[in-house]
Amino acid sequence: MEKKLYKLKKKFLIILSLFFIHSSYGKDEIKIGISTFLSGGAASSFGIPLKQGLEFMFNAINEGKVPAPYNTPGIGGKKVSFFFIDEAGGATKQVSEFRNMVQRQKVDVVMGYISSGDCLAIPAVAEELKQLTILIDCGTPRVFEDASYKYVFRTGPHAAMDNIAGALYLKRKGITPKKIAAINQNYAWGQDSWADFKGSIDIFFPGTSIVSEQFPKFLSGQYGSEISAMMVAKPDLIHSSMWGGDLESFIIQGATRGLFRNSKVFLSAGDHVLPSLGRNMPEGVIVGARGPHGDLAPDTELANWFKENIKKELGIKMTTQPMHKGAMAALFLKKAYDQAIKENSVFPSTEDVIKFMEGLTWDTPSGPAYMALGNGHQAIQAMALGVTAWDKKEKRAKLIDIEYFKAECVNPPEGIKALDWIKGGFKGSNC
């Protein structure tokens, strides 16, 4: 009997020791679930590059290879454990996947979301579950303009600056549009982008005529009728915030029919299709990258390290905005957690680290970023625009004739909605 009890006791102790080993191991990691497009038309030029940027930066963080001040291994001293899910499927599906990551997979942080529709759906659930959530890319200003959140942050600026800078670029270059057409995807991102650009044009170029407004369905892929309508209207400037596979298709179809020869075109967020289109990318197109990313990135140690090393690792010729956006989000986490430990000497709870995230300023491969809006939950940064050209030596499409705009020049002050700020004549802007 005693022998049997001894064996049971020994077995129990082994199981108990394994439990503590597992628990200890779990405490040495920070677990992150990430949603990005892994399939469909938004994947190849946007979702996958975002994944690559995050993978590269998290791996570099784990190995302590990021330049100072990020050169200590891990986030808050913990190894980063991360996985990806597919953002394809719509907002309802993403809400379900979000709950699964939080309630079943027990993540410490949720990150990601490219679609503005998804970004409008996720925050309420994050607040309900008290889950720290980092929105990486989506551009609609409505996220923090229409509500306030405790557990949600957005590390990328919203779309207003893309379009304000677009109008300012025209003014700086002496381009005075008389007739403008627009083609934007028919959901929050496209609608908000066009409203911001149209409002900015009204201020800088009063009297300009809007001759065609096209809102094709997201992921439509075919734009023959929209292109025909714009060509008939004969605009001297075309605005588009389209992105991903939609933008690739529009450019190829429009170029074939001479759209880019007859009108100046402004693509507010178009840099990410330059690698895939290559020689098929028309020259002379004004292009933004939702910030100073890729060819538009500043000449800093961190920016150059990131661009050189990720290009080498992936065997690519240029970086694009989704890669930079992923890196920005990863470094935001590291800066906040590291700062919390530096001041408190213990790994912070979610409630504690939020205090360090609010209003945070951090350096990125795209220059400094500031949590300046949304009660310290919405980032702003500088903006840059360039013009497409073919580089014969590098054999790639690139951006030249670059203009930079300070963050305070193209982003509204705290507490003011972007469109209201635009309509009010950009009061308080610092250009």
Predicted regions and their residues:
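N-terminal secretory signal peptides that target proteins for export/translocation
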Residues: 1-8
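Hydrophobic h-region of N-terminal signal peptides that target proteins for export
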Residues: 16-25
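Immediate post-signal peptide segment of exported/extracytoplasmic ligand-binding proteins
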Residues: 25-34, 71-79, 171-178
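Beta-alpha junction/loop-to-helix N-cap segments that form part of ligand/metal-binding clefts
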Residues: 29, 45-50, 64-145, 155, ...
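Solvent-exposed, acidic/polar segments of extracytosolic/periplasmic ligand-binding ectodomains
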Residues: 30, 361-431
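Extracytoplasmic "Venus flytrap"
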Residues: 33-57, 61, 86-91, 114, ...
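Extracellular/periplasmic ligand-binding modules, especially the Venus flytrap/periplasmic-binding
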Residues: 51, 244-247, 294-360
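Extracytoplasmic ligand/sensor domains, especially the bilobed periplasmic-binding protein
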Residues: 52, 92, 107-215, 262-288
